[in-house]
Amino acid sequence: MSNVTPKLVWPEDDYVDESLLEDHQGPARLEYDALVMLANLPPLTEEIMSRCPALPVKTRSTPEYTLVLDLDETLVHCSLTPLDNATMVFPVVFQNITYQVYVRLRPHLRTFLSRMAKTFEIIIFTASKKVYANKLCDILDPRKNHIRHRLFREHCVCVFGNYVKDLTILGRDPSKTMILDNAVQSFAYQLDNGIPIESWFHDRNDTELLKLCSFLEAIPTLGRDVREILRHKYRLRDHIPFYSIIHQQEGPGRLPLLEVAPPPVTEPNDEQLITQVVQKHPQLVQG
């Protein structure tokens, strides 16, 4: 049973007039953990920077631009406990134990993958284990019409217990590479290549993927560095005034890990969080 790949019956998404959709803006605010992670991000080690690319070189038929996609809470929501309205269930064997994985698909995923594959080299890059993610990709794209490559947890860099997706492992032109992920800290080393998206769990009225289609399809026609476009659109650095300060610190003189207190029960906004860090660590804003 564990070797059988279930056939996916795609759910019918409600029709949405794209012309009426608002422009995609990403999350309204960054999570507290993401702010702390980005403020403390250490430089990549020489060992990591000298890694060989995990992907084969492009062929002539490979699209010029690359779109890296996260899986969990970006394209799907999965659980080992039963989910209401699960689209499918599939078995995964891990350490000789069979688990049933319940899957919900984010609305408009099929349309998104189909359209993006016409314009981009699609790569799945997930912090999940290969035994689970590989099987899920086989179900989502059994004929490999959309997803060209897959990278998993072993391809991530572990930083303070977080799995970070260093895009240099792709061996692709950074000026033509983007990553879509619900966790900003996942692309912390290439912040300007990132497209942040709200985490998805169950909302059947979600249109985030559909909002992105026209925007992404237009990018290759502009002939510009994608980092300039995404930096201007999402302005992630505006949320993190410490980002450039921290990245100027290298070697023994680097600032120590910030011991930022956890947020109170009523979560503060980004400005309040930043004020908390500055008050506790004034050296960050000195000279």
Curated annotation (Swiss-Prot):
One of its GO terms (molecular function) is phosphoprotein phosphatase activity. This is CTD small phosphatase-like protein 3. InterPro entries: Dullard_phosphatase (IPR011948), FCP1_dom (IPR004274), HAD-like_sf (IPR036412), HAD_sf (IPR023214), TIM50 (IPR050365). Its EC number is 3.1.3.-. SUPFAM superfamilies: HAD-like. It is an enzyme of class 3 (hydrolase). NCBIfam families: HIF-SF_euk (TIGR02251). Residues 60-219 form the FCP1 homology domain. Belongs to the CTDSPL2 family. Probable phosphatase. Keywords: Hydrolase, Protein phosphatase.
